């Protein structure tokens, strides 16, 4: 089974069920704590839409392109993508702009929900258990943006995540009957909270063209937090990790109707990950590419910059594969 957060309990179960492997109470607590830390850390990465894209229809690009590249997609990874649901609602508020120093101050953030529901086969008993997990999050950050030159900008931000994790496990088999007392309420059928700080910096090189614009960007993030709650007797640990995104985006404007502008949007990113995120994603780095059509609204609004539809590919992670996606406020 694929190693992934929210499917994490399977790995713990496998260790517990080994007949030759005896865990002390402290070792079991440490194992559960690490799994909870990975849940929160990986949710931070997967709910950042600049880092990971989830669509409404998933597929294996190998079947479309007549290829056999394991890093591009597989039946297992596409099946896993189909079980994951991610919803985000980003927002941004301008605070103050100093025209003399070309410094902008703003608040931005997002509300998010990430969940997965899947069958869990613990032993060869013919009946699978069911496990449903989700993480709800609210993120808010302050950003100081400096215009270094005509093309270069530099942003420094500090933010915080408030996150809630919930596990609902249904025992359909007797595979875990002898171990229910040490996992129920500790690893499964429980909940936990985390408050996570995230400083980050971003450099951006922008070129405006008669046909639109393109830019290169590099954004480095580090996060560290404190967990608490019912899970694992309150020993939820300290989610910690980092990710670094380097990418290029291009917007080609091909049609304009009044205020409405239609554009072709393309992007290519490399994402490096570390800390509690790398094992869950099955890699230390992966790539994402997107292409699509965007349209700005024909009326003036501060809430919607553009909407569109397109295609996204993930290469090299546990969630490799392709998706049809809806774009919202791409910039």
Where are these regions (language model features)?
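Subset of outer-membrane beta-barrel
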Residues: 37, 41, 78-101, 132, ...
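Outer membrane beta-barrel transmembrane domains
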Residues: 228-331
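Outer-membrane pore/translocation modules
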Residues: 30-38, 42, 96-243, 268, ...
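Residue-level signature of outer-membrane beta-barrel architecture
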Residues: 91-97, 142-146, 201-209, 252-256, ...
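Residue-level detector of the transmembrane beta-barrel scaffold of outer-membrane proteins
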Residues: 53-64, 102-110, 153-157, 215-219, ...
């Amino acid at each position: 089974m694929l190693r992934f957060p929210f499917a994490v309990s399977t790995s713990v179960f496998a260790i517990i069920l080994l007949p030759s492997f005896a865990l002390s109470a402290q070792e079991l607590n440490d194992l559960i704590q690490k799994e909870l830390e990975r849940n929160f850390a990986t949710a931070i990465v997967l709910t950042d839409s600049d880092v990971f894209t989830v669509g409404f229809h998933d597929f294996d690009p190998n079947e479309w392109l007549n290829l056999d590249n394991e890093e591009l997609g597989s039946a297992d990874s596409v099946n896993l993508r189909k079980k994951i649901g991610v919803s985000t609602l980003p927002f941004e508020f301008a605070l103050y702009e100093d025209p003399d120093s070309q410094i902008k101050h703003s608040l931005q953030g997002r509300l998010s929900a990430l969940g997965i529901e899947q069958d869990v086969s613990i032993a060869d008993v013919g009946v699978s258990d069911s496990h449903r997990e989700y993480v709800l999050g609210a993120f808010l950050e302050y950003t100081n943006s400096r215009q270094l030159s005509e093309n270069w900008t530099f942003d420094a931000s500090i933010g915080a995540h408030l996150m809630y994790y919930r596990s609902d496990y249904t025992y359909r088999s007797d595979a875990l009957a002898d171990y229910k007392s040490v996992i129920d309420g500790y690893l499964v059928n429980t909940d936990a909270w985390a408050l996570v700080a995230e400083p980050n910096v971003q450099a951006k090189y922008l070129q405006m063209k008669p046909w639109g614009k393109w830019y290169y960007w590099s954004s480095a993030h580090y996060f560290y937090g404190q967990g608490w709650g019912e899970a694992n007797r309150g020993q939820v640990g300290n989610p910690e990790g980092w990710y670094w995104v380097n990418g290029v985006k291009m917007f080609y404007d091909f049609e304009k109707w009044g205020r409405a502008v239609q554009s072709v949007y393309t992007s290519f990113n490399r994402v490096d990950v570390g800390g509690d995120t790398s094992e869950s994603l099955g890699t230390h780095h992966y790539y994402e590419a997107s292409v699509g059509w965007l349209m700005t609204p024909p009326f003036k609004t501060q809430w919607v910059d553009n909407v569109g539809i397109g295609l996204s590919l993930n290469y090299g992670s546990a969630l490799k594969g392709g998706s049809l996606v809806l774009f919202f406020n791409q910039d």
